[in-house]
């Protein structure tokens, strides 16, 4: 996808034109959701976080704001919005949810639903010190360029898995986060 000039209207049109394929919803898996925040600009951005190095799981990794569904969450979307508010102070009412991508199975046993939402450019992010060490924005056109992701095939717990790897500035984007970004790129019609 040679979309260095990808604008928000093009992104929205493509996303809404090509609806994600229905996917299985595993009732026996723990559920989680992440917000995939698209920053509303003429050349939109993709908001990402770097997890605190002090966390027990996925410490220091680049991620979307999100986490496990809890009993206060009415829906997966509500869980993603709550977690985004807790982790980086994005007010739920500031997010225009435009859809969801197919759920992804995590290595920690969760089924994670990516919730795609548009956020205003003038938000003041406040990273939760317990969970987030950095908040940064990547140009959406660059994030959705499939050629920037490189595959790595790994064998874990008796199964073969493909994970995707990429760098942006000094951030290493890989695993589930890179996979979700690639899925979003494919959803809007990018070709490998």
Curated annotation (Swiss-Prot):
Cofactor(s) demanded: Mn(2+); Mg(2+)
Gene3D superfamilies for this protein: Nucleoside Triphosphate Pyrophosphohydrolase (3.90.79.10)
Pfam families listed in its UniProt record: NUDIX
Molecular function (Gene Ontology), one example: manganese ion binding
Keywords: Hydrolase, Magnesium, Manganese, Metal-binding
CDD domains linked: NUDIX_CoAse_Nudt7
EC category name: hydrolase
Domain Nudix hydrolase: 29-160
Gene Ontology biological process terms in this record: nucleoside diphosphate metabolic process
InterPro entries assigned: CoAse, NUDIX_hydrolase-like_dom_sf, NUDIX_hydrolase_dom, NUDIX_hydrolase_NudL_CS, Nudix_NudL
Motif Nudix box per record, residues: 67-89
Residues engaged in binding Mg(2+): 83, 87
EC number, UniProt record: 3.6.1.-
UniProt-listed PANTHER family: MITOCHONDRIAL COENZYME A DIPHOSPHATASE NUDT8 (PTHR12992:SF11), NUDIX HYDROLASE (PTHR12992)
Known role: Probably mediates the hydrolysis of some nucleoside diphosphate derivatives.
Record family assignment: Belongs to the Nudix hydrolase family. PCD1 subfamily.
HAMAP family: Nudix_NudL
Protein name: Uncharacterized Nudix hydrolase NudL
Gene name linked to the record: nudL
